[in-house]
Each structure stands twice: as C-alpha cells, then as structure tokens.
Amino acid sequence: MKLCHAIFSTFVVFFVASGAGEKQGESQLQQIYDELSILSRVTNAIALQAAALSKTVKIREVITELLKVDNGNFSNLLSLDPAHLVKNLDELHKKSLQAVSGSNEQLQQDLKEMIAMNGLLAAVESENYTEKATVNSLIVLKKVDEKMEICDESLITIMFNISQAMSGVPFAESDEMKIFSSMKTMKKAFYKCISKFPAFMQKLYEYNYPLSGFLELNDTMNTIKALNELDIANKIPNMLQKFKTPFLNILAVGDHRNKGNTGKLLQSAITLFKKTVYSNSSTRLFLTAGFPESGDMKRVAKDLTSDWFKKKVSRGKSTAELETALKPFNQFAESMAHVFKSWNNFRDDFQTDSALLATIPDLLSQIDDYDRNVDKKKFLENFEATFRTCFKNYKNALDQGEETKFLKNFSAVYLLVRSVQAVEQWASEISTMFDEKAMDVYFEELEKLTPSNIKEQVEKITNFDDFLKIINKFTMLKSLQTQYESAYKTSNSSELSLSKIITDAGLVDTSKCLEKDKLDSSKLLKMLQFMQHMMQLDIDYSTLKANLDNFFELKKKMLETEKLVKGFTSRSARAASNSGSPVLKIKDSQKHADHLGNGLLAIKKMIISLKEKATILKSTMFNAKANQEIREKNPIDYIKEFWTNPGPSIEKLVSDLEKLEQSSKSYRKADLLTIRKVFEDGSKIVGIPEVFSYIDSQFEKKGSQYSNERKITQALSTLDLNFASHKGALSAASLSVDNLKLYFDDLFGLTPKVSVQSESTSPIVVVLICVAIVLVLVILAIVGYGFTSNGRNQYINLYLYYFGKTSDYEKRWRYSLFMDRVDGKNVLIDSVREINATNLLKAVKRGAYINVCNKYGNTALHVATRRGYQNLVEILIKHGADRSFLNPQNKTAEQMIPVNYQETHKEKIERFKSIESIYNKYRKKKFKLCVPEKFPVSSFHIYIEDRTDDNVTNEFTTKFQSITSDEAMITTTHVVVKTTEDGILETDDLNLLIWIFHGSIIVRDTWMVDCLRDEKLIEKDCDYLVEKVKYKGIIYDTVTQWSNAMAKATTPFLYGVHVALCMKNCPYLASLTAIIQGQGGTMLDKFPDKDAFNKGSHPYLHKNLGPIFLLHDGTGDLDLYRSDPDKMFTLFTEQQFMDLLFKREINKDTNPKIIPVLVDEED
C-alpha cells in the first residue's frame, strides 16, 4: 500500500512539474510576449530612472504618454487655475439656494407656462390684424392661371420615353428605334422651351409671393386657438398676483450681484476639459513603450524577482543592487497609480456629464448679463395693469364652425401653394443644370447617330450622363403640371379668410392697445428666463462641482508626482555619482526600451490577429456580388487591385502567423538570444494592406445588403494586418535584445574574462597594414558618404550634370516656383534688380531656373543687359542663360543694348562696350545649366480641398502634420483635390480653380490613400498629378501645362491684356482679379478710355484678340464694343474667359516691331 502511494505521489509531482511552466489556454506566442514584457518593463524602468539621474527626464511628456493624452492640451489644462471661478460659482449658488428655497415644482411649471403665454403676447403685439382681416384667397386666385404650361407635351413625351429606355424598361425593337431617333429632332422644341424660362420664372415669383401669404394665415389661426386654449386673458393677471413675491425674491439675487464673466470663464475651462479628454495622443509610444497598460509600472518590482527574470536574465545572480537602484522608480509608479485613478475619474465623469456641462456656461452668461437697473416691482405692476386694460375688449370664444371652415379651405389652398413651390424649385434646378455650350455639343452628337445600334451610340456620347440627368428632370414636369391643375380646381372654389374670426375675437382693438401702451413682453421674457436659470443652476450645480473637484484632485496628484520626480534628480544624482548606479551603465537605455517595447506591441498585434484567423479566412469566402462590389465600386484604387485576388495573400498571412506560433514553442525553452528570434521571424511576415476598415465603410452605406459580409469586415476593421509596416520595429527589437543581454551579463557578472597574449609584429607589416587601412578608410569614406543624404544628393547631381537628360531637369524645375523664391520674390530677378552678383552666383550655381521672366516678360539676362550690368550678364551667360529668348517686344537679350547708347547713355558707354564684348566672346560657346537642387519633402506645404474623404484627410494630416495645413496660403506647394475615377478634377468653383493658375502642383486624392499605406510615396507626387479639369461640362487637359509654365515663370499669359467688368454681380471677383493679375494682366477699376490704347495693338500672346477684355454677364447692351471698327475690344462671359485660360492657346505676335498696347507705354 505504501509503495503504491509513493508511486502515485511521484507521478503527481512529475505531472505538476512538467506543466508548471505552461499557462493553460494561452498560445506559445502569447507566453513569449508575456515573458519578454518583463524584460521590456525592467528596461523602460532603467531608462526612466537613468534619465532622472542625468536630469534629462521630461516628466510631463512621460506622464501624458502613459495617460495617452495630448501633451499640449494636458499642459494647458494643468495651467488652468479656476479658483476665482469656483469662488464666484459658490457665491452664486449660495444666493440661488436662498432665493429658491421656498419654491417648488409648481412654481417651475408655472414659469414654463408663463414663458409660453408671453410668446403668444409677443405674437399679438407684432401682428397687424387689420391687414390679416382683409386677406381673401378668392381675390388672389383671380390673378393665377388655371394651367401652367412651359414645354410642348410632345417634347415631354419624348423625354419620358428616353428616360424609360435608358433605365432599362423593355421596349419592342422598332419602338426603341423610334424613341432614340426622336432625340435627333427634339433640339428646336427643347430650345423653344428653354427660351420661355425667364418669363416663366418671373410668373412663378409673382404667383408664389401672394400665395405664400396664406401660410401666414394659418400661423395667425394657431395663435388665436392658443390664446383661447391657454385662457391667457384670465391666467396671466392671476399668476402675476399669485407669484409676485417669489418672483421678486429670485430677481433680487441679480440686483445684489455685480456683473461678472463667470459664464465665459467656465466656458474656457470646459473647452480645455473637452480638448484634453477627447483628443488622443499619437498611438506610437516613445518614452513608455514598455508600459502599454496602466498597471504595468507597478509590476517592475515583482518582475525583478520573477522566476523568468532569474532564469533567463540574471541567471541566479542577486538582483538586490538593481532593485535598490530602482526604488525611486517604484515610488514614481505608486504615485502614478494615484494619477491614473484621478485621471480616470475626471475623464469618465466628464464624458458622462459633458452634454449637461456644455449648457451651464450659457446659462451663467445669461445670468451675468441680466439687467440690474430695472425696477422689477414697478414693471410687474405696470405690466399687469396694461394687460388688463388691453384685454378687456378680447373675447375668449372661437366659433367651431368658422374654425372647421377655415381649416378645410386652408388645406385646399395649401396644396396649390406647395404645387407652385414645387414647380419653382424644379425650374430653378433645371436652370442650374443647363449649359448652352454643352447642350450644343450633345445635339451635334445626336445628329450624327446612325440607325444601327443607336442605343449603344447614345451611351458612348461624351458626358451623356449629364444630358440624361436633364432629361430625367424634364420627365417630372408632366406630373407637376397635373398636380398644379388639380390643386387650382380645388382651391378656386375655396374662400380662405380670417376676417370674421378676428373681428369676433376683438383682436384688432387688443393688438392696437398693446402696441400703443408698450406692454414690452420682451423685458418680461428676460425676467422669466433669469428666474428659470437660477432655479436650473440649483439643479445642475452638484454635477458641475463634482467635475471641478475631479479636476482639482487630478491637478494635485499630477503636481505631487512631478515634484516627487524632481526630488529624485536633486537627491539621487549625488548619491548615484558616488555609488555608480547600475542604471547608468547601459548606453542608450531609452532607445532600447523604445525598440523592445514597440517590437512587442507589433507581436501583440500578431497575437490578436492569430486569435481571429478563422474570421480572417472567412473574408476569402464572400459571395460573388460582394466581391464584385469591392472590385468595382470601392473608392480606393489599391483596394480594388488587391481584391482582384485576395485569397492567396490572406491565406499566406494566416499560414505565416501559424508558423510563428509553432516556432515560438521551441524558442521559449532556449536562452534570451534564441528567444529574440521571434522578432526576426515576425519581421518576415508581410501581412496585407489596410483594406477591411475601408470595405466595412463601403458595406455600411449599403444597409443590410451585405449584412453577413459586414459582420466579418466589422470584426477585422480594428485589426492591424499590415505587418510589413512593423518590420523596422521588429528588427530594432531583435538588436536591442542583443545589447540588453550584454548589459545584464555585465551587470550580473556573467561576462567571461578574456586572457590577452602579446605577440611581436614586424614594423614593415605594421606600416603596410596602416597604409592598407588608410586606403580602405578613404574608399569607405567615399562610399559611405554616398549613403548619406547629402552624399547621395551630391553624387546624383554630378551624374545629372554630365549625363542627365532634359527630362531629368524638368522633374526638378517643376518646383522652381517654390525653390527659387525668397519672401515671395524670384531670387534671380531680385538679384539683378539689386545688382547683387554674389546672390545671383549662388542662385545659378544651385540650379535656379535661369530663363525665368518678370511680369513684363523679360528674363534676368534681358534686364541685366538693358541696365548695363556687365558682371551680371557674364554670370548669366556662363551658366546657360538662353541668349535667343524673345521678350514681348520680340527682342533677344543682346538686342536690349540701346542702338545709339554713345548718344543716349553717355554715362554707360564703357559698360555697354563691355557687354558687347562679352556677347561676342561667348557667341559660339554653349554652357551647361547647373543641376537644380532637389525640392525636399520637408518644404512641402500641402492644402487639401473640402470635398475629399474626411477620414482619409484626417489620417493624412495626422501622419504628415508638419507639411499639411487646413488653410490655403500663398506658400502652398500642393493642392490635393477630389477627382473622378479617371483622375479628372470636376468643379465650377473658381476659388478652387485659382490654384491651377497660381502654379501649385495639383494632385489626386488617391495620393493621400497610397501615402497612408506607404509613406515613402509622399515623394512620388509626380505619379498623382491631375492632368485634366472639367469646368462647366467641358474637359480641358492643360493643368500640367499651367503648372510647368508657372514653375518656369514663362512670358505671362495675359501680358498686355486690360480687363474691365461689365457685370451687376460678380461672385468670384476676388478670384478673377487674382488670376488676371497673376498672369500679367491689368484689372481696371473704371471703364477704359479707348484713346489711351494704340490702334492695331494686341496682347503679345494673343495677336487675334483686342487688348481690352470686357467680361460681361449677358445682361447689358455691348453691341457698340462688339462691333468696334478698330477691334480694340474682346468680349467674354466669365465662362468664355475661363475657356480661353483653360485652352491655353497661344497666338504669338511675331512682328519684329510690336505696337505697344498703351499710348504712353515705355519700351
């Protein structure tokens, strides 16, 4: 028996021992994560303690990172000192308690009822009942037509049939042929219909104005009913008598209190609370990566004595010295526990009470602003007396039959009013959609249709979808006309009038009396609201006070913790310098803590993903319709591409995670250097790009259509499956484990001592080795320099200078508009203007675009030659300035030397002779252009237009915060715009289009999406350029032409153009002015005098046009200028002018003797 018991005991001990190290239910990878987290926490504690000893710790940043709040907002919060605010609030609350102590729920209810009745009084005061009594629908309806026709019924029928056919309604083949053939013949009827629109719109306005007055009659009727139902004629005087004493007690609080700004102070405090609570910090941990959870810091003390740490790190050696060194950190951890608790209380209570708290500042502001100079008692007595006098003529009786008759007739007239408004809205929408030029294009295309496959031909017409929208809109007209005619017949026999009801009630005399005796219901309203606010403050104060107390407690614990850490830096530093603290022995402890902590966070994401592997695999089994929806309609290109065949990538992800789990089992049993291989294996897992959050958003918009698939995408949308983005963190973590092992081995005396033996070496060998080392070092230095950013750029520039193509230069010249400007001025033009050879030489050597033009179309070489700056001329020629470039006078730079300078410029004779010799000297020589500097990403100023996806925009601005702005600025380099799937910018907004003519680089919104996936693509803006713009239904492909022209500052497109506006209203005046002036034109502030311009002159780049541009809206008579015999005027509508700009067609005046535009223009 004893033998059996011994055998059984031995078996139990063995079983328990063999399973002691395994945590049931946890994966091997999870257990490695838990164990390495011990090392991560200890390392982070050492790093923070070392920073405290060396006085480099940024304790506020450490705490805010632990709390996961924004450091700036939190610091602003702690700087808040609301002591004065609390004092005012306590004082006000005390007075409010005294004032409302005798009040009850009935008083609060009566206050609400008084406010409602006071609103009716205000309506009676302001209403003109004499006028309302004269309104009669039969009189108005005599002026309204029985029918409302604008288009021929045959045209509406054609459009209805086209709409049905295009939407897929089946027709016989012969009928369908007739339907589409009829499109070719409807042009005349369509334009006839459209021509009637101005008169039709005017008629609608004439109908709608008097008819809408009937709606006001209903409001008047509702007021009369309310006056009767509330019985205010008797109730108001009685209530004023009954509650005068408690009212005056409450109102007295305002009289005995100085006017303050309590509401504004509280609003500022709550705004800071809200910013701090609701704005999260960056998810990337830098100082506390070892403590991802709130309780992790307190675990460090136990980590040092844990079995795993003793076995894998200290390997049985005493940890007492390290425990002693980290005692101050443990005190910090204890103090932080109180901070966490205070923060959680503050955050949770504020989130619960935020809606209520948001209403209190306004309530307090109204109390602060209350008028204390009114004699309340006298006012209430006068109010009651005036009310009784005026309402003695009022009869509180409403005839039931009259009311029923009114409501019946109102329903009939109301249908007519709504019918007219519906037609008016339809006409307004059609007018907005209609574009004459685009319609001409559609009808031209329709006339080309042939009988065979006519529907397919129609569908291929460019932008036919826009035409179809107009057709669909017209199909609504028939039903709108029918509704109108039906409503007219019903209402035409219905007399709508309030004359008898108003007369019977005596409202005319009552309202006149109220107006004459100045009842002043608005002042009573302010008093009633003040009383309401005081009573409400008594209810809300406890919530407000609790939140303020939470804040004070949080601030107290924060300051105590910061003071504790500052104490460590003063006392501990002296002790550490004498004893040699072990926490100071490791180099870059903070870096290792950062790398190891963030590497483990990446492992944690893999663990979470591994738990969801079944759900991940289900995503490969979506039905065909859902897959097609993603491939064809997801707004993000890379997701469409990925979902063409997502299965292999997703299955490989799951397979890689399972392999990592399998290898973790063997790693756990080995030493630290073997365990770290989990990071190396993890870094090889690529994963998949972020797709599920975007797909989930796509499915969410479809309602229940993809409910089964959405359960999967919802579950996966929170997972980070793009493990390739964590490769750097995992690799860094692996290297940090190596360094940490060396540190701990040295700390615990585990490093083996190496014996050193001396050997004699030949001096010749030593010399040869030294020479070889020097040569190797020189070669390595040259090669190594090439791996630095400066070296790489310099080597690339050398290559481009000797072997580069024009296209290579063009890629960099795209940024010349921004690279070559200082304080908004081009550095070349400015250097010549200032005669600054030093700055000019610096600019050309760093590759500034050398043929840039000033606003007069002259290059720097033209200006330098014209002014006789021979040293500047030589610098420009020797650095590749184009000597054949023609300015707007069709002169080369050399031709800018005055012909008779010996007579006209005697003081510059030597200068011009020197310049002539320079041109002769280098006439047959060509010079290379210097390589333009690469425009750094850090100098990007990116502005994102409002129509882009809000989620993508917010993520992008967060990720690239330093180079993005939510404000448009003169320094903006890139403008991200919403484009179609074809990459076309569609907009009629000149405030957005102005960026094209400003010279900013216009990029598609898909750039943001791809940059979020791979931030290196921020440098590849050239792959996302917008090349086409659709304005007023027409597509133009000159966007990049404008960018390049502005980058190189070519001859201004509108040089010699003088613009005058002939419009009653120009909503885009500021944008048009900026475009015109930016392109070298002149915006005139008054109508031009033709005599000030030379006959026969033209803008330099538009010899086919007159120099005076008149922009008009088509309303004025401009035939005199249109038929000008001298062809000095060119007339444009705003759209035609933009068409000129977008086409960017140039007709250069090649005449060697250009006629100046202005009579007094200088050469």
From Swiss-Prot:
Q: Name one Pfam family in it.
A: BRCT
- Report the source organism: Caenorhabditis elegans
Enumerate the InterPro entries for this protein: Ankyrin_repeat-containing (IPR053345), Ankyrin_rpt (IPR002110), Ankyrin_rpt-contain_sf (IPR036770), BRCT_dom (IPR001357), BRCT_dom_sf (IPR036420), WSN (IPR003125)
Question: Domain named BRCT: which ranges?
Answer: 929-1025
Organism domain of life: Eukaryota
Q: Where are the ANK repeats?
A: 856-885
Q: Does the keyword Repeat apply?
A: yes
Q: Per UniProt, which keywords does this protein have? A: ANK repeat, Repeat
Q: Where are the transmembrane segments?
A: none
Instruction: Read off the PROSITE patterns from this record.
Output: ANK_REP_REGION, ANK_REPEAT, BRCT
**Know the name of this protein?**
Ankyrin repeat-containing protein F37A4.4
